[in-house]
Swiss-Prot record:
Listed PANTHER family: LARGE RIBOSOMAL SUBUNIT PROTEIN BL19M, RIBOSOMAL PROTEIN L19
Classification of source organism: Eukaryota, Sar, Stramenopiles, Ochrophyta, Bacillariophyta
Compartments, as annotated in UniProt: Plastid, Chloroplast
The species this protein was found in: Phaeodactylum tricornutum (strain CCAP 1055/1)
Keywords per UniProt: Chloroplast, Plastid, Ribonucleoprotein, Ribosomal protein
GO molecular function: structural constituent of ribosome
Name of the protein: Large ribosomal subunit protein bL19c
Keyword rRNA processing: no
Source superkingdom: Eukaryota
GO cellular component: chloroplast; mitochondrial large ribosomal subunit
Length: 120
């Protein structure tokens, strides 16, 4: 009984911080994420583009792992989707995938790492 009440309290608090205007994020999507960066007194938005290779859903703790290739080196970054540091998320392109996690892309290079694009 006590566990049910505490879960309701947790859900009520979390619901205040969940972003409502998020696009539907799927594995294999190419996304552009705007991250707020504070440098001294200035605040700016830095964009990060890449492919979603993993997604973990847990209400407010939802994370996505985004991978991109920069100067021949693979870079992966994990983003908390509902974080106040995330300014915007835009889906640039969707791809057809048959896996829940695309970790196999880590071993592929060049054209082999391309995903088949889907059109809406």
């Amino acid at each position: 009984m006590l566990k049910l009440k505490t879960q309701k309290v947790i859900d009520a608090i979390e619901s205040k911080f969940i972003k409502k205007d998020l696009p539907t994020l799927k594995i294999g999507d190419n996304v552009r994420i705007g991250v707020k960066i504070i440098e001294g007194t200035k605040e700016r938005v830095q964009f990060y583009e890449g492919t979603i290779i993993a997604k973990k859903n847990s209400s407010i703790n939802m994370t996505i792992t985004v991978r991109k290739i920069l100067q021949g080196i693979g870079i992966e970054r994990v983003f908390l989707v509902h974080s106040p540091k995330i300014d915007s998320i835009t889906v640039l392109r969707s791809s057809k995938v048959r896996r829940a996690k695309l970790y196999y892309l880590r071993n592929l290079r060049g054209k082999a790492s391309r995903l088949k694009q889907t059109f809406k």
